[in-house]
């Protein structure tokens, strides 16, 4: 099948979301439906998908998202999307965002940041994620951010680390 183009999907490298009082939500990651539903639709319509994250490590599925509740209560649909997810070799071995930048962002037609709590761990102030998001904005290419994915837009700020640091400290950035 001839490809219509390429879509870059940014996912988290993190496997634990820091909470108050030193607690950590260890099940944090991407939400199954927020990643697989749009990725399947894009692939079905002829787009090639590239997964990337800050470390190039396998992203974690948010444990709370693997339930039929997020698929209209349909257990068969949940299993179908789990199987689809398992077939995504690029998700198991994502590129590093820095390597994607080095290979050229102009080859991509759109960027997608699925939700789940993962983006809150590392995409919100990742400098490379910021470079990607600024590039897509400057080139007027589609940027889709789902549920918790919009937190990654903070990375596009020129002072992202400062803003995120202030937020974590409880300051009004």
Residue spans for each PLM region:
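Extended, subdomain-level signal for the structured scaffold at the beginning of enzyme domains
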Residues: 1-139, 152-172
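Conserved, well-structured core segments that form or line functional sites
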Residues: 143
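Short, thiol/selenol-centered motifs that function as redox-active sites or metal-ligating centers
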Residues: 146-150
